Amino acid sequence: MAPGQPQAIPLRPEFILPQDGHTKQDCEIAAAKRWLEKNGATYSPLKATLLGDDLYSHQPFCRRTLRHDFHFIFVCKPDSHTTLYNWVNLLQSPHRRTLTTQVKVGAHFHPYTYRYANAVPLAEGADALTVNWFELTATDPEGKVLYRNGWVTDFPITDQNVPALAAAGRARWKIENENNNTLKTKGYHLEHNFGHGKKHLASLLAAMNILAFLYHTFLASPSPMKTISSSAPACPPAKPSSTTCAPHPLYPLSQLGCLVRLYAPRL
């Protein structure tokens, strides 16, 4: 997936299921780790960028993402990352920078304010992973806050690329609209009753629906092969993951590659 691109292409899913030899209940992070182990070698040559919510923006998973040669843009909330935000709040210019732009929304221009800082610790400790943090606050012309969110990434951040990084971070919601919503409301009937089968029935039915959606996405594309080939050289990754390998229409960060969102659909 990518900002400005209508398609969201599902990749091979990794289901949250009890694992052989494990006594603990399976979870989203454990499934994401398995997805990386199974699929990392396939997608890392695309220089793909993993998108995810605050669940993923913790040191062990960020390190694992980098070991598999992926980039990442993960949501980073103040309540769950107190060390990072304490560090950011102590920084002053030029180590913490602010950029304000005007974005046309309908008939009006809305102020978009970006704050960012490079090389801040993600956690406590001398061996803490250093990441780059950025935040977007969108307001209406009267100053009312319409949207605010923060992320961490391994991409170095500048005035030139921070708007595109924020657009990429926000693009993960395309999965809710173009993928999940379509599967649940547009004839695929991907619903909670898929969880009532025994053994592998639920996973099989869900996988068949995801595969059907993938084929329909390519068949609906004016040039299905161009969707793939045009992205390979500079293509902005998990559990069922979704991507459209396409150049970002807004900015020069071709190194973002494909954008792949890590998420757990609720069936």
Which residues are covered by each model-predicted region?
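Short acidic-glycine loop/turn motifs at beta-strand connectors
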Residues: 1-7, 140-144, 185
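Conserved, well-structured functional cores that handle cations and Mg-NTP chemistry
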Residues: 1-63, 68-70
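Hydrophobic, well-ordered secondary-structure segments
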Residues: 13-41, 73, 82, 88-102, ...
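Conserved active-site and cofactor/substrate-binding residues in soluble primary-metabolism enzymes
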Residues: 27, 160, 202, 206
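Short, conserved catalytic/metal-binding motifs centered on acidic residues
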Residues: 32, 50-55, 72, 151, ...
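An anionic, glycine-rich sequence signature occurring as long contiguous blocks
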Residues: 77-172
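A short, flexible helix-boundary coil/loop motif
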Residues: 100, 113, 184-267
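Short amphipathic alpha-helical "interface-anchor" segments enriched in bulky aromatics
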Residues: 159-194
